[in-house]
């Protein structure tokens, strides 16, 4: 992969501090062996998430100083609406406080429209909050990821794709009336930040149209997905990122977005509709009740100003090349040391295959979460589990489900860390690998009923 140096100058820095091994153990025990509950000041390199943790540009900060905090009709909303229409081609724009805000106001309305008695949403892979909001809306989440993604060693280019034969069979089996929507997650986070090909998106959209099912694009990492299409599909090699984005979104009816990823902001989301004014108005009612007035949706005007700028900056090809090559570099360091990862590396994170690194820990003892804890103990690096802990229990039986993947996600914030930081992370994980056979699994001390991985407290087995 072509590598370029950081395509920016650093104008402001924030000190970070190293801690001792004893301090880290005390902090992790106080947090109930859950990295989510650690204090940020006790973390040296924070790879928990790329959501809202990036650095904004000087132009975005200038936009913040021009914030129009009018309750209704803010100038910054008009700027954001203009940016969305220009970039995505969707006419009806609704800001939300973040991506889950869009999900909580959209999904109940799609379920209401569903004519069947057993509504479902089908996705390549629902992320955690998406699945939670599907279930809160009274529906069931079905994941139909390509089986090629399950082999983390296979160098398949499009591991975020839908399994198209299973998608067709599932719709036929359940019936059109029971499918409230098809959600295309780009990139596919839970599979390793893996891209969805344009051909796969086109096939999904065609199938949905044939069955009169709305297509929802979960657009958190839309620009990274477009970059992969340009890089890996010869048919799009000469297209601009903007052109690819327009073609991707022409295949959807609605998109939700956590703008805290490719929108390059610290807070914000979007719920946008290509042309369905009736649905847009129904969702607006929920927005006013749950998010805020329809021209701010829980955001300050200054945040909308930063987002309007960030959406454009996030599609810059030079920036995206730097961004994705930084992820690839960390992946290469780990792979060279014999640490199993999801290959090829995705757009926003390196995903370590804990099932292979810690084969002695069963799924119900959460091997990827145990690995996350050990990485923190080793060097103060905070990652996050994407596996059975996140997946949760079967809502019908209450039994722990075994996830398809047991992955440690090392999520790289945008425009924050340098190559030296990546080398430090790699060195820490290599040290953990040397004692992998000594790592123990974890069990619950406290288990919340929903989205348990955020606030659960655990203890070593």
Swiss-Prot record:
GO molecular function terms listed in the Swiss-Prot or TrEMBL record: tryptophanase activity
Catalytic activity: L-tryptophan + H2O = indole + pyruvate + NH4(+)
Modified residues (N6-(pyridoxal phosphate)lysine): 261
EC numbers, comma separated: 4.1.99.1
Keyword Ligase set for record: no
Superkingdom, natural source: Bacteria
Protein's pathway: Amino-acid degradation; L-tryptophan degradation via pyruvate pathway; indole and pyruvate from L-tryptophan: step 1/1
Entry-linked HAMAP family: Tryptophanase
PANTHER family: BETA-ELIMINATING LYASE-LIKE PROTEIN-RELATED, TRYPTOPHANASE
Family affiliation: Belongs to the beta-eliminating lyase family.
Protein name: Tryptophanase
Organism of provenance: Aeromonas hydrophila subsp. hydrophila (strain ATCC 7966 / DSM 30187 / BCRC 13018 / CCUG 14551 / JCM 1027 / KCTC 2358 / NCIMB 9240 / NCTC 8049)
Organismal lineage: Bacteria, Pseudomonadati, Pseudomonadota, Gammaproteobacteria, Aeromonadales
Gene encoding the protein: tnaA
């Amino acid at each position: 992969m072509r590598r370029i140096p950081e395509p920016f100058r650093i104008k402001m820095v924030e000190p970070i501090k190293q801690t001792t091994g004893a301090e880290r153990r005390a902090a992790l025990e106080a947090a109930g062996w859950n990295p989510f509950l650690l204090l940020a000041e006790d973390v040296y390199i924070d790879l928990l998430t790329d959501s809202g943790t990036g650095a904004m540009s000087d132009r975005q900060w200038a936009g913040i100083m021009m914030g129009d905090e009018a309750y209704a009709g803010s100038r910054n909303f008009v700027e954001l609406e203009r940016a969305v229409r220009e970039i995505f081609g969707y006419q009806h724009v609704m800001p939300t406080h973040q991506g889950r805000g869009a999900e909580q106001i959209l999904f109940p309305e799609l379920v209401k429209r569903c004519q069947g008695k057993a509504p479902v949403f089908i996705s390549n892979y629902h992320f955690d909050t998406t699945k939670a909001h599907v279930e809160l809306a009274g529906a069931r989440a079905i994941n139909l990821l390509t089986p090629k993604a399950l082999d983390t060693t296979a160098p398949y280019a499009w591991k975020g794709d839908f399994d198209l034969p299973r998608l067709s069979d599932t719709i036929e089996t359940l019936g059109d009336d029971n499918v409230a929507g098809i959600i295309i997650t780009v990139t596919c986070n839970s599979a390793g930040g893996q891209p969805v090909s344009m051909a796969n998106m086109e096939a999904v959209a065609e199938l949905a149209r044939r069955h009169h099912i709305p297509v929802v694009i979960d657009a958190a990492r839309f620009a990274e997905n477009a970059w992969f299409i340009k890089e890996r599909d010869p048919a799009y090699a000469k297209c601009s990122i903007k052109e690819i984005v327009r073609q991707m979104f022409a295949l959807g009816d609605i998109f939700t977005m956590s703008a805290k990823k490719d929108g390059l902001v610290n807070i914000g989301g979007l719920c946008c509709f290509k042309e369905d004014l009736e649905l847009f108005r129904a969702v607006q009612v929920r927005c006013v009740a749950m998010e805020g007035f329809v021209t701010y949706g829980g955001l300050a005007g200054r945040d909308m100003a930063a987002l309007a700028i960030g959406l454009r900056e996030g599609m810059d090809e030079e920036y995206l090349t730097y961004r994705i090559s930084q992820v690839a570099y960390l992946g290469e360091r780990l792979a060279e040391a014999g640490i199993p990862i999801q290959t090829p590396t995705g757009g926003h994170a390196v995903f370590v295959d804990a099932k292979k690194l810690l084969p002695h820990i069963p799924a119900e003892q959460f091997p990827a979460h145990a690995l996350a804890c050990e990485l923190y103990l080793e060097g103060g690096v905070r990652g996050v589990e994407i596996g059975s802990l996140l997946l949760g229990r079967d809502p019908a039986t209450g039994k722990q489900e075994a996830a398809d993947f047991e992955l440690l996600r090392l999520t790289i914030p945008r425009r924050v860390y340098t190559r030296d930081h990546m080398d430090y992370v790699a060195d820490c994980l290599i040290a953990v690998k040397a004692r992998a056979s000594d790592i123990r699994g974890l069990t619950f001390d406290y288990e919340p009923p929903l989205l348990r991985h955020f606030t659960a407290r655990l203890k070593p087995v």
